[in-house]
């Protein structure tokens, strides 16, 4: 049976995911495919390039850099997370992304974004970690209201989390059968309807289908989490999630809080490492 690693978004809650991934890298845990949404895509690419420690390193180092994430960046560029800094200067110069290792890794890597024209999810299979792949990763993490939409491959895209919390359903639809799922909220979390009605109305003027998708986002999220839970009960999935809500804001500027979220993920992965190995080994035998 083909295995897939599934990564939820959640902005800086993604440091939990980074902790899990680095334990996987340290212990040679591998999958046939991996997929991420939003922060799950932005940080998950380091699992494919096998760069253990990179994501927590640069996030702690630059979390207070206004070019990385700041209201000033939002006012100046239209992006809360500075696009040029995050997707060019950082991976090309400041903390180089290993594109060669990414391209040579046989694990397939998928990222999901939301099509502004339809309000539906669209997915991209990355190839070499180059400019096109990074444009899709940026699109996957382009949060509405605080990011420009990304135009790529005939689409105008925003954050994948508008539609899909994780790529679980998509990966299942293309033939993957066993899943390790990394969530960034505790099990049983129920998403409530967003109170940002005014922002949705403003968005409706430019992207009416996105506004419609946001209006039912909580329903889609909760239904997806239920499907994942049922898959776990059926023995088709194994879920890692924080035991308690993570003490990090979406745009967290405290490096110690980022480290604690990372350490929480690493501890969860170490505790479940034998169970994960057994689950993946069983998948090879089925």
Regions inferred by a protein language model and the residue ranges of each:
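Patatin-like phospholipase
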Residues: 1-37, 45-286
């Amino acid at each position: 049976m083909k295995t897939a690693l599934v990564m939820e978004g959640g902005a800086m809650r993604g440091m939990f995911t980074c902790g899990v991934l680095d334990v996987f890298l340290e212990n040679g845990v591998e999958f046939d495919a991996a997929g991420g949404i939003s922060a799950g895509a932005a940080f998950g690419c380091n699992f494919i390039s096998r760069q253990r420690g990179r994501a927590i390193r640069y996030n702690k180092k630059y979390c207070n850099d206004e070019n990385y994430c700041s209201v000033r960046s939002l006012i100046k560029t239209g992006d809360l997370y500075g696009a040029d800094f995050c997707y060019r200067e950082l991976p090309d110069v400041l903390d180089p992304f290993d594109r060669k290792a990414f391209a040579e890794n046989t694990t397939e890597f998928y990222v999901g974004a939301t099509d502004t024209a339809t309000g539906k999810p669209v997915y991209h299979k990355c190839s070499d970690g180059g400019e096109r792949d990074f444009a899709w990763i940026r699109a996957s993490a382009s949060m509405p209201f605080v990011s420009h939409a990304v135009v790529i491959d005939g689409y105008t895209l925003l954050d994948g989390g508008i539609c899909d919390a994780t790529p679980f359903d998509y990966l299942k639809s293309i033939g993957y059968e066993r899943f390790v799922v990394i969530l960034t909220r505790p099990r049983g979390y129920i998403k409530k309807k967003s109170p940002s009605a005014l922002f949705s109305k403003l968005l409706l003027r430019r992207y009416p289908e996105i506004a419609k998708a946001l209006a039912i986002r909580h329903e889609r999220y909760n239904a997806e989490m239920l499907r994942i839970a049922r898959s776990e009960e059926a023995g088709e999935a194994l879920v890692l999630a924080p035991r308690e809500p993570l003490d990090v804001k979406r745009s967290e500027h405290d490096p110690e809080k980022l480290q604690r979220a990372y350490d929480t993920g690493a501890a969860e992965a170490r505790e479940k490492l034998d169970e994960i190995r057994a689950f993946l080994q069983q998948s090879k035998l089925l």
